[in-house]
């Protein structure tokens, strides 16, 4: 039985499309359908709003999907987190007009605009506010000051809120896009295997994004010093170089190491000092430990 997977539309879609593509599952989609072809007969995909993903997984109508933890918390859906993909990071924040005396807000009944009705209500009750919530459907930041005293909204940097004359007075939670599965799917042996294999592919892609492969040559007399100075995931890959003349000391060695990208600027000069030559850097597609 195929694994039924939910792909979120909106701002999350682009990163999920790229992740799936790098995992070897390219989305084929035309403008008239919400059911893309992933080129795998064991996968059935459907595109939905991220707000709906958690509840549909809990209902069991789908087996796995992608959404932010913010929408899982908002819906209260009981699902299993499989993997934090780490992108589309946002904070769910409480914001008011910059000129507002936030302490004075507790002396009156306030209007709060938000897409996150449950999260907002929980926060407001815990902090002693009297309130009425107005549900929004996007562009929440435009409601104050005319139509709301406060908003609860998601933000990546806070820049949009600042540009609309708002200040952040509280943070409810921090969210990122995650891969979730339904509890029912994980009880099914075949579907659980599919889910675990997808998670392995996603981890491999995410790990590869953080690393590059460095390939270099080194003469035999400097080989030992170079090897001792190398970082690597496990052990470097080493192969003897062909020495056409058969001279003393042989032809040296070719060495490969997978390293984190942020190590490269300092590492390449270090390798040169240790005697490496012909250093080549190239990207990786997947890294499976």
Write out the residue ranges for each language-model feature:
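Short, structured active-site "lid" loops
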Residues: 42-63
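Small-molecule-sensing regulatory modules
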Residues: 2-42, 47, 66-80, 84-91, ...
């Amino acid at each position: 039985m195929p694994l039924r997977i939910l792909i979120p539309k909106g701002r999350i879609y682009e990163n999920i499309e790229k992740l799936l593509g790098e995992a070897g599952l390219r989305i084929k989609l035309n403008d008239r359908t919400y059911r893309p072809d992933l080129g795998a007969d064991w996968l059935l995909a459907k595109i939905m709003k991220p707000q709906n993903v958690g509840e549909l997984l809990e209902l069991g109508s789908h087996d796995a999907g992608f959404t932010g933890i913010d929408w899982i918390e908002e819906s209260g859906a009981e699902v299993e987190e499989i993997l934090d993909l780490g992108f589309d990071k946002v904070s769910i924040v409480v914001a008011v007009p910059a000129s507002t005396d936030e302490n004075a807000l507790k002396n009156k009944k306030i209007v709060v605009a938000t897409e996150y009705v449950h999260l907002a209500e929980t926060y407001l009750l815990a902090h002693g506010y009297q309130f009425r919530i107005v549900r929004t459907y996007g562009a929440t930041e435009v409601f104050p000051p005319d139509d709301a005293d406060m908003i609860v909204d998601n933000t990546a940097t806070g820049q949009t809120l600042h540009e609309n004359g708002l200040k952040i007075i509280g943070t409810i939670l921090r969210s990122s896009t995650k891969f979730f599965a339904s509890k029912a799917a994980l009880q099914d042996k075949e579907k659980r295997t599919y889910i675990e294999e997808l998670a392995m592919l996603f981890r491999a892609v995410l790990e590869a994004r953080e690393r590059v492969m460095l390939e270099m040559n080194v003469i035999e007399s400097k080989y030992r010093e170079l090897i001792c100075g190398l970082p690597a995931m496990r052990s470097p890959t080493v192969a003897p170089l062909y020495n056409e003349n058969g001279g003393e000391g042989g032809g040296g060695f070719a060495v490969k190491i997978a390293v984190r990208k942020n190590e490269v600027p300092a590492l390449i000069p270090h390798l040169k000092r240790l005697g490496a030559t012909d250093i080549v850097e190239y990207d990786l597609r997947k890294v499976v430990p």
